[in-house]
């Protein structure tokens, strides 16, 4: 009985598998921006999951050359050769053959699916939906970053405009005061009180309507 070959196609190969991928790869742009800014997630849940993943020991299959090497080492040492786990040509009992006595064998059917093709189609559909969700999240994050940068620029422009206005008003006050002092000195009756001078209120400020007397 020949082993059936499974041909896995690309996610975007089928037209009817789901919605088409967006023309702009926002996820790739987000990854490039993350690497450029050297951003790393430090959420406790992600760190715990990463620690568990690194501590987990994955069962790797034993290479076929190891039993032969153990036999040669046993012969060189003068000891009895170590027998392999199974004889040559003897196949390990599969789970399907072991469970034949318990329940009847259902050929060509998987749990929850009628065939392997149906399972592959479902898996392809799930992967397509996950890719679209990743693209949407990446697009939202990129848009949010753009909005934040726009707000920062607007705030900086407002501060710069306010600074320019203050400098302009200060120059105008100096020019007006210089003209007044050159003509005739201000009388003490027209000068403002000391508390107003301490907080920066002058006659020129009042004339320019920058402060309210109410």
From Swiss-Prot:
It comes from the Eukaryota. Expressed in skin, including primary keratinocytes, spleen, kidney, leukocytes, testis, lung, small intestine and prostate. It comes from Homo sapiens. Residues 1-26, 59-108 are annotated as: Disordered. The keyword Coiled coil applies. This is Protein FAM167A. Transmembrane segments: none annotated. Residues 118-156 form a coiled coil. Keywords: Coiled coil. Belongs to the FAM167 (SEC) family. Pfam families: FAM167. The keyword tRNA processing does not apply.
